[in-house]
Amino acid sequence: MQILNFVAAEIEPPQTVLGKVYQHDSVLTEEVMAYLQPQGGGIFLDVTLGGGGHSLALLRGGAARVVGLDRDPAALQAAQARFAAEGIPGSRIQLWHLNFADFDLQQHGFRDEQGQGIPFDGIVADLGVSSPQLDCPERGFSFRGEGPLDMRMDPSAAQETAADWVNHRPVEELIEIFTRYGEERFARRIAHHIEQARPLATTTQLAQVVWQAVPPAARRGRIHPATRVFQALRIAVNRELEALETLLAQAPTWLKPGGRLAVISFHSLEDRLVKWAFRRDPRWQVLTPKPLSPSELERQRNPRARSAKLRVAARSSQM
């Protein structure tokens, strides 16, 4: 199967992608399948393909065809190899190297005999950063290992990196993003320490600056003091909340009447956007008044799933 809108030279060889670097367990898969109900056939859109777990579950569950999107070239190649190993024919899966905020039904979806984009029966979005991205120091998403301050979901994209943000943005702007995207109460202290320590090149350098910036009492918690700063920078670099707002606004136009959108979020900023969009937009009918969380068994098997929340809504027939 072909990856569309894609240059193969942008990414690492398949053996690297399929090894330790790209092993990812999809979260809340059973719950997503229960709401999207692929057993009846139909076509589905996976806007955050990752390692292909949700798409594969849809195809195994009876979906006729799936369109998969991802910004990360490594994720696309890993998923492509996984589908091939599972014997999924290319006619059932269409992959795009694409930010879901840029998806266009006519251009990127399946088409009918008249050449018109076919609306989907369901859409799944598994937001945030994946385990392979976190576990690869070269991607710069985590301070657990030393790597460049990158944090781009698409390393091939011509966009600012986290290093560009911490080294060149005004202090007041850093304070704003640490507060808004990281809900960091020591944002001002941290931003001023970053200004004094510039230039910063690696994840561990930034983590050490944050550690020194916060009061000693804040260093003794279960969560490392740099966690919220790294989250804020990642969200800012990739414009994640803006992309999510676009998805929530556009998804009703990509769905058939009654088609469902399942969104998995991992922090309160994302969940709040999903919750209010589902409640306030008359095009949505909420199917999960309260978000679903992973079972105890899933949390034990995959500790990173513990903060996941699933919300589902159906496209109203009144549009």
Curated annotation (Swiss-Prot):
Predominant localisation class:
cytoplasm
Coiled coil spans: none
Please give the InterPro entries that the UniProt record associates with this protein.
RsmH, SAM-dep_MeTrfase_MraW_recog, SAM-dependent_MTases_sf
Source organism superkingdom = Bacteria
Identify the stretch(es) annotated as Disordered: 289-319
**What reaction does this enzyme carry out catalytically?**
cytidine(1402) in 16S rRNA + S-adenosyl-L-methionine = N(4)-methylcytidine(1402) in 16S rRNA + S-adenosyl-L-homocysteine + H(+)
Q: Which UniProt keywords apply?
A: Cytoplasm, Methyltransferase, rRNA processing, S-adenosyl-L-methionine, Transferase
- Please state what class of enzyme this protein is: transferase
Query: Which subcellular locations apply to this protein?
Result: Cytoplasm
Name the GO terms of the biological process aspect: rRNA base methylation
EC number in record: 2.1.1.199
One MF term from GO for this chain?
Answer: rRNA (cytosine-N4-)-methyltransferase activity
**Its biological purpose:** Specifically methylates the N4 position of cytidine in position 1402 (C1402) of 16S rRNA.
NCBIfam families (alphabetical)? 16S rRNA (cytosine(1402)-N(4))-methyltransferase RsmH
Q: Describe the family membership recorded for this protein in Swiss-Prot or TrEMBL.
A: Belongs to the methyltransferase superfamily. RsmH family.
Q: What name has this protein been given in UniProt? A: Ribosomal RNA small subunit methyltransferase H
Q: Which organism is it from?
A: Synechococcus sp. (strain JA-2-3B'a(2-13))
What broad taxonomic lineage does this protein's source fall under? Bacteria, Bacillati, Cyanobacteriota, Cyanophyceae, Synechococcales
